[in-house]
Structures are given as C-alpha cells and as structure tokens.
C-alpha cells in the first residue's frame, strides 16, 4: 500500500474507508479535534505511536499553542511527527538531532511558501487569545473556511517530506 494511503475507521458507522493523509487530517479536524491533533493523528501510526496517544500529546497545541495565537497548531502537529520520525533517542546523538532540525526547517519553509506565515493569529487575521478574536473567528466560520486549508497543507507537506525521507533511506 502506498505511503499516502491510510485505512481509517469512521467512528459513527464503523465502516472502513480509505483516504490519503491530508484527507484523514481534515476528517479528524472536522470531528472536533484541534489542528495539531488532526495532523499528528493522521500520521501517528507512521511515526510509531497510536492515534489516541498522538491526539492526547497534541491537545494543548490548538489555536497556536493553547489558543495563544502563536505557531499554528497544524505546524506544531507536523513538527511533532517529524520529531517522532527522526528524533534522537540518546542525548549524544547529534546526527539525529540535526536531521530532525533539518526536516523541521524544510517543513517550515514549505508551509511558509504556501501560506506566507506561521503564526495562528496572523494566518487567521484575528487574535484567538482574546474573546473578541475568538468571536471574529466564530463569526467568520474560520474553523470551516480557513483552518482546514492549513491542516491539509501541513499534512501534504509532511507527507511529501516523509516520503522523500523514505526514498533516501531505501537508497542507502
């Protein structure tokens, strides 16, 4: 099965459906999870953890880190996946540390090239750390009109980076 395809169990019907990672991330987001949970949840199994643990790990990162409007949760979710995939397991493993940072930098560059920005409040055009900003986001239906694009973009970029890494690893 290609890396881009995942089997996902629809919670309400219990039936098996096949979708790519960006679609899976968007589906998780539409189920009510935050943007970070959606991205890491879609890639959890590929990164060596179960989806429930991934979603719990990312629970505080929505809305730009606990709704502070800082780094977009779709971005931090991808960064967590990169860390799980490449991160060091020994403090002295500087090679894996550098590989992780290299992959994060590449991800950030690609996300910024698509969207211009990395901060939630700038991407949305409102400050979700304030009641007024949250109301603006609600009134504008940003959860359905803006955020899904960032979740999909993040998942597409992450999928591409992980696939490129798999190809390089298989050539060595």
Kindly give the residue locations of the regions a language model identified.
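Short cysteine clusters
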Residues: 35, 72, 120
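C-terminal binding/interaction regions
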Residues: 101-172
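Polybasic, low-complexity association/targeting segments
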Residues: 18-31
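Acidic-glycine-rich active-site phosphate/pyrophosphate-binding loop
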Residues: 42-60, 126-131
């Amino acid at each position: 099965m290609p890396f881009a395809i995942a089997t996902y169990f629809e919670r309400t019907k219990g039936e098996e459906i096949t979708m790519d990672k960006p679609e899976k991330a968007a589906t998780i987001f539409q189920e009510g999870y935050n943007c970070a949970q959606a991205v890491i949840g879609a890639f959890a199994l590929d990164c060596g953890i179960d989806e429930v643990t991934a979603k719990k790990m990312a629970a505080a990162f929505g809305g730009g880190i606990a709704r502070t409007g800082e780094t977009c949760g779709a971005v931090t979710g991808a960064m967590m996946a990169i860390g799980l995939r490449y991160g060091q397991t020994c403090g002295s493993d500087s090679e894996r540390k550098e590989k992780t940072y290299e992959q994060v930098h590449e991800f950030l560059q690609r996300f910024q090239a698509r969207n211009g920005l990395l901060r939630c409040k700038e991407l949305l055009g409102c400050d979700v750390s304030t009641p007024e900003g949250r109301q603006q986001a609600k009134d504008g239906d940003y959860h359905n009109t803006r955020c899904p694009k960032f979740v999909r973009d993040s998942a597409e970029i992450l999928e591409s980076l992980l696939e490129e890494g798999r190809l390089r690893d298989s050539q060595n």
